Amino acid sequence: MVRQYQELKAQHPGTLLFFRLGDFYELFFDDAVVGARELQITLTARHKERGDPIPMCGVPHHSAANYIAKLVRKGYRVAICEQTEDASKTKKLVRREVVRIVTPGTPIDPQLLEPRESTFLAAVCARGESVGAAFLDISTGEFRATQAHGAESWKRIAADIESYAPRELLFPVSLAPLIRAAFGATPKTGSLPLKSGLRAQETGPEENQTSDSHLSMTDSASLSGTLTPLDDWLWQADDSEQLLIKHFGVRSLEGFGLAKKGEAITAAAACLRYAQETQRAGAAHVADILYFEPQDHLVLDNITVRNLELVQALGASDSGRALLVVIDETVTGMGARLLRSWLLRPSVHRGEVEARHGAVAELHASHMERDALRASLKEVADLERLTGRLNLGSAMPRDLVALRVSLDRVPTIRELLANGDCALLQVLNESLDELADVRSLIASSIEDDPPVKLVDGGVIRNGYSAELDELRSLSRNAKQTIAALEAEERARSGIGSLRIRYNNVFGYFIEVSKANAARVPPEYERRQTLANAERFTTPALKEWEAKVLGAEERILQLESEIFSLICRQVATETARIQATARALACLDAVTSLAETAVRRRYVRPTMHDGDELEVVHGRHPVIEVFIDEPFVPNSVYLNNSTDRLLIITGPNMGGKSTVLRQTALICILAQMGSFVPAESARLPLLDRVWTRVGASDDLARGRSTFMVEMTETAAILHNATPRSLVLLDEIGRGTATFDGLSIAWAVAEYLHDSPERCAKTLFATHYHELTEMAERLPGAQNYQITATEREGEVVFLHRLERGRASKSYGIEVARLAGMPPAALARAREVLQRLERYELDVFAEETQVAEGAMAVGATRSTEEAALSRATSRAARRRLAAQSSLFDLANQKIVDELREANPEKMSGEEAKQLLSELKDQVM
């Protein structure tokens, strides 16, 4: 047995081998050490008496899925080795085979899957300046590919990979340096030969990682998942194309949009091959592949997704305060995944967006229809993943029942949609297949409430199989049959004392006394002679015995055969089931958006092909849900001419960042197909939303907060377009005042003036000097978030109005934060001195300026604006330096005033002078 284990382990290095022994999965040698540690189970040993004990640990087979899930979530690959023959039918070592390898990117068991999130396996490859990537969710069959060419190709593909957030990324070993450059990680190479020679690196975190192990993407700032290098020979273009052609059963890949997309084809083939090898199955449910380009959807990079808190809140304690949580009213897993996809990749096609708006509008208007649809959809299972399990050979009895129950709801759903006017809802209705044949097959063959596992028996309905019914009857009625047979033999032989008995040695036999032995019929076969009795058997008894003793075993075997046959029959209708699943998912998503619109008072936006972005009384969709007071709505107007750069000033905590974020969220909601939180909205179709908000460092890459800020800003300046929306919040605050102001000024000016980069921009800042730009830039406008003072306290009004703010009210915010009164008093004193000194400097500068104007000094409008901003900044800096010097030395002045020279000795005066000298700045 140990030799068998070692042979299988040698065929699957880089995995933890779950070796089936009876009712347990056992791990041996190093695998046992790792398994015991990671699963926190007892580590024991085999052959202790020999002096060379073999470490081992094990888990019960009935709960193994949970243990496997723990290991895979930690980055391990698990090879599942099963007994593939009946131990009772062989005297040799039972045959065992690895039936599946579970990796982070190829899970199909529910314990390893998030019901409301996709689980992607990704692959990336490159030739020259062409880079291809593919994304496969083996649990549902969703398959996508893309390709980029040129100097920026790696950045573009890296952005796609970030967006899809794969659990595992495959790549050629030779690309390790580029992977490191693109994702900030250093993958190591190794080998994991699979069935056809597929080679991946070995797996296992922590110390295992130091020896040819995988590298977790959590070491990178942009991805979380497992990096898996594969041998270069597996990435041959010709072989890859033929693999896909054969799998899809076509003559060419041109129909999938993959013509002349060599790198995309190679990446897609790598994904498919890896999935087939790990699952030991053909993956027939992967029946299509979609080629996409970045311009096919509104681009939201990971920075924007994080900053806008689209799917996850930034604060650990605010995990539920993300946009997706607020708008997700879906009632099926597949609907939830589709809604999430719409949010992360909104459409840029007006027809598609307005079709979703139309569906939401109809469902929004009909409360009864919407509630009835949601009630029916709640009974629909995750048909996408259920179909995946059917095709991968891992479906359970209750999966088929769930499929039947789900399909039973389709006629009702179709009836509800029949009288609607919306084009999209009619298309969905036509896509719904009632699959009456599949429903009938399952209803006639599978019990309504079968056990969880097939081996528990009782899965196949009575009446479906005559042989199975006979076996069950035989098993249930064994005692009655024995009594009837015994009575029959007594009557036939005339021996009243004849008995039919059973023991473990001879099985069933007929026993008669010695006195009656001569009266037995001639067809009786002697089995055993005892002192006072004879034991016989008959052909009929032997036949019945064989049936009874093998009935339970045969029942399970026959049920398994019938169940497998039914699964194969249902799987032949995969295309029809998937089409219905997609339609139900879409219906769930638009119904969810309608429900959200009703609950949150959202309105239908007007989409257009122009450049005007107008939101009237817009609200932040997340903040308004979680605050205890009425949300203050604000209106925003942007275009690409007169209002393309809005410079927003205002107090801390006033709501500048909220206005920025809510504007972007409203645009994203509209383009995903949702209604929006506003009184009204007229919106253009954006190509990308850029954000530079918040403060964060990247110590793993040696990047400071300011470096991260500048890197993100540089990406915006290089890639923004007139169709983009840019949010800039406090650019330049991470460095010295003059440096920061200079950078902020230049960034705003660049976005305004550059014809190819003049995106619609919201620029929030505390550099009030930037408000001077609005006087010379034709497309710049000043806005402020208002506040007022009442009875000595600041009241934040949170209203966005035209104009520039004069104060930041930072000390008031510090008071609200709980700063000690003494510190607040000192801060007010310092501020008063700074402001007084600034006014003095300003008065002197005004006199100089007036003198210069009197002698005819002139300057251009542009120079004047920049000069005023520079003067204001210089005045602030000079005031700070001079006044702070005075404040710091105030203690010295106070001590000198209190000193009385007439009463001091020479030594005391000398000591005081020395102490004061040490205090001078």
Language model segments and positions:
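Active-site phosphate-binding and catalytic loops of NTP-dependent enzymes
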Residues: A79-C81, P104-L113, G282, A418-L424, ...
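Conserved phosphate-binding elements of NTP-dependent enzyme cores
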Residues: R3-E7, G14, C567, T574-I577, ...
